[in-house]
Amino acid sequence: MGAGDLLGLGVDLGSSGLRLALVGADGHSLAERSSAYPRPFEDPEGWRQGLATLVTALPQHLRQRIGAIAIAGTSGILLRCSADGAPRGLALSYATACPEQIPTLAALVPEGGPAASASGSLARALRLWGSFPQALNPSQDLLRHQADWLMGWLLADWRWGEEANNLRLGWDQQQQRWAGSIAAQPWAQALPELVAGGTGLGPLAAAVAASLGLPPSCQVVAGSTDGNAIVLAAAPGPGDGVAVLGTTLVLKQFSPQPLAGAGVSNHRLGGQWLVGGASNGGAGVLRQFFSNEQLEQLSRQIDPNRPSGLALRPLPGRGERFPIDDPELAPVLGPRPVSDALYLQALLEGLTELERLGWQKLQELGAPAVQRVLSVGGGANNPQWRLLRQRSLQIPVLNRAKASAAAAMGRWALASIGWEQPAPPEIRHE
């Protein structure tokens, strides 16, 4: 089989389900699959079972052409596992804030960094360290994020982690080391050995390759976060920002320099800094009140030029990461008007205000002013929401609902074949 016949398998572990895409040498998808997690989102076995089910459902003749696989994981999902990958309980969600860890965080890492927040992965790691009857044993226990744990299953080797997934755990991408005094802690051995996204880590474990029906030569490539993957899929140009309208609201843009601020992430990608933040609010809050069918029907009744007059803060629960870093910030979901369409409009306006504050926050910290917003994710299918956002932001807002994070990871994986340490794919400018 020639190199041009090989396919890249990209996996997107979203907060609402799994997606995968098979990508050919021309960059186009040959097949895409998606499903909900077969277990609760925080159960790691559900990630593994869901991936195995989707992969084995692909036609065998296509599976035999897969040359590399890369995974984008939901940023901030952290679990404790044994050295051979066995989960020791459920993972802690990205929305889990740990305000009781603030004094310890202050002693470990510099103030204002991504790991200094009570909503960051380092705070969750500290809670995992102290919340089990048997203390964390660094020689027998590991702390891994979602994508890194699943990557370990593919390799039957859980020592690796990918940089972007570990920034809020305390990895300093500029200095290429753990921030503050993290490396001096007795539990530092439980942290992963980090590599850059796009790095080839070796072939699939033989047993995994056999169970999935994949070639034993298939390479496992370090992926990225789901937010970074969807930015690659959206292909932003100069001056563009990318808003991911999924279960949560994620904002990303390119900046000539990294930013310093609570709740803000900085990723080195394609020779630039991809900066941004993720709110706990998003379309997931809408689903607390409406089905997808209701959302579609009620949205048609919204007049974007007539404000609802309500001021809601659509958070799924207490605590926020970005644009406000406050583990005690409470949602505001009422008063609820009689009209369901008006209530939906008010919720969308509340999410729009979170977005406006987010872009404003990034600019205050030193990012260039966004001139245009590209919208991806499920919310990018809603034209009324787009108009509400465009009116609030006072800049063009375009919907790119077909952008696929899984396909972006497939292209990322395919680009790695033949290189020992492949560079991340270039960002395409339009």
Predicted features along the sequence, with ranges:
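Pocket-flanking alpha-helical
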Residues: 77, 100-104, 231
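Short beta-strand-loop/turn "lid" adjacent to the catalytic site in phosphate-handling enzymes
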Residues: 60-95, 112-119, 137, 147, ...
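Short, conserved acidic/polar surface loops in the N-terminal third of protein domains
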Residues: 79-84, 103-106, 254
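Intrinsically disordered, low-complexity regions enriched in Pro/Ser/Thr/Gly and acidic residues
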Residues: 186-188
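Active-site core segments that coordinate phosphate-bearing ligands/cofactors
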Residues: 9-10, 106-118, 126-140, 144-145, ...
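Short alpha-helix plus adjacent loop in nuclease-associated cores
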Residues: 94-110
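N-terminal glycine/serine-rich phosphate-binding loop of ATP-dependent small-molecule kinases
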Residues: 1-91, 134, 139, 210, ...
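Short beta-strand to alpha-helix junction loop
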Residues: 43, 174, 197-201
